[in-house]
Amino acid sequence: MKKDIHPEYRPVVFMDTSTGYQFLSGSTKTSKETVEFEGETYPLIRVEISSDSHPFYTGRQKFTQADGRVDRFNKKYGLK
């Protein structure tokens, strides 16, 4: 590998803006904001959705049923 062409990989704190949840992860993203997390200072990256607020992970998922061709056929001929 060539030297000095890759971005610096370092620990950063990601913060979910909708819930305030923070977690530490490695990333190449940069930020001017910093935050103290577990006694250390890290760059802060704000995200809109994380596993703490996404409906798939929280279990508050809404299921919508789209009527397809088979459903319309069954409804039309009273099969179901």
UniProtKB/Swiss-Prot annotation:
Cross-referenced InterPro entries: Ribosomal_bL28/bL31-like_sf (IPR034704), Ribosomal_bL31 (IPR002150), Ribosomal_bL31_B (IPR027493), Ribosomal_bL31_sf (IPR042105)
Task: Kindly state which keywords UniProt assigns to this record, in alphabetical order.
Answer: Ribonucleoprotein, Ribosomal protein
Superkingdom as given in the UniProt entry:
Bacteria
Listed GO cellular component terms?
ribonucleoprotein complex; ribosome
* Induction entry: Part of the SMU_1296-SMU_1298 operon.
Matches recorded under Gene3D superfamilies: Ribosomal protein L31 (4.10.830.30)
Q: Which residues form the signal peptide?
A: none
Q: Which GO biological process entries does UniProt record here?
A: translation
Q: Name one GO molecular function term.
A: structural constituent of ribosome
Q: Name one Pfam family in it.
A: Ribosomal_L31
**HAMAP family with a match to the protein in the record:** Ribosomal_bL31_2
The annotated subunit structure for this chain is:
Part of the 50S ribosomal subunit.
What the record says about family reads: Belongs to the bacterial ribosomal protein bL31 family. Type B subfamily.
Record protein name field: Large ribosomal subunit protein bL31B
Q: Which organism is it from?
A: Streptococcus mutans serotype c (strain ATCC 700610 / UA159)
Q: Which lineage?
A: Bacteria, Bacillati, Bacillota, Bacilli, Lactobacillales
